[in-house]
Regions:
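Catalytic alpha/beta core domains of metabolic enzymes, predominantly
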Residues: 124-128, 139-240
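Active-site beta->alpha loop and helix N-cap motifs at the rims of alpha/beta catalytic domains
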Residues: 1-145, 151
Length: 240
């Protein structure tokens, strides 16, 4: 599988008391569904998945799936510290009809996050997952940065189709791309650069860019007030 297009990671809206605002979530997903985006990422870091209970995660996945347009590719953030719990949530996402699982690196026991442990975790998930799996590396949040060498090794697994690389390390991305060229699958890299992103977000709401895409302000698209730091919006998605 080779992913094409833009996949915005949606927020999870809350009431002031901390409960999930499901009607607003439904409205937000419907708005995203009316954009040219190829799909939607549910329960990523922006979706605050790590702060939700297992039942809340399931309810968010269900609500988002029901509200999404049928032509959108849906990516479910299903990664937790346990491989077994990750698989349970992934299986639920598959039952709902999600297309891909995005699994963050486990990180709580950092001293135990050896190469062997990471390989075992992702291979266990990939072996049993009913969905294709994307590795999610976000060292700024987890404190663990999966080495490029491990990603290259994991790329050999047919059910591991890519990585969301949020370290901002362009050299690492280059190394991963070069290291997976031998694999008989397509490879694509999409990067968000600091010099481009602020200009894109500054575009008029609903306006058309001469470079080929409709640009919608994040606050309008989300349907709720939000604040976004554009200081270092650098990340890359690599499909392998």
């Amino acid at each position: 599988m080779l992913l094409h297009g833009i996949f915005p990671p949606i927020t999870t809206p809350f009431y002031p008391d901390g409960n999930v605002y499901f009607k607003k979530l439904e409205s937000n997903v419907e708005r995203y569904s009316r954009t040219p985006c190829a799909g939607i990422v549910v329960l990523g870091s922006t979706g605050e998945a790590i702060l939700l209970s297992d039942q809340e995660r399931r309810d968010v996945l269900k609500t988002a799936h029901q509200a999404a347009a049928p032509n959108k590719v849906l990516i479910a953030g299903t990664g937790v510290e346990s491989a077994i719990e990750t698989l349970r949530l992934t299986e639920y996402a598959a039952e709902l009809g999600y297309d891909i699982a995005m699994v963050r690196t486990p990180h709580y026991y950092k001293k135990q996050m050896t190469a062997a442990s990471i390989l075992a975790f992702y291979r266990t998930v990939a072996d049993r997952s009913p969905l294709p799996v994307i590795i999610y590396n976000f060292p700024q949040a987890t404190g663990y940065d999966i080495p490029a060498e491990l990603v290259i090794e994991l790329a050999e697994h047919p059910n591991l189709i890519g990585i969301k690389e949020s370290s901002g390390d362009v050299e690492k991305v280059r190394k991963m791309v070069e290291g997976t060229r031998h694999i008989q699958r397509s490879v694509t890299v999409t990067e968000t650069f600091e010099a481009v992103t602020p200009r894109m977000f500054a575009a008029a709401t609903g306006g058309s860019s001469g470079e080929g895409g409709e640009l919608v302000q994040v606050g309008v698209l989300a349907g709720a007030s939000s604040s976004s730091s554009l200081a270092k919006p650098s990340s890359a998605a690599v499909s392998i």
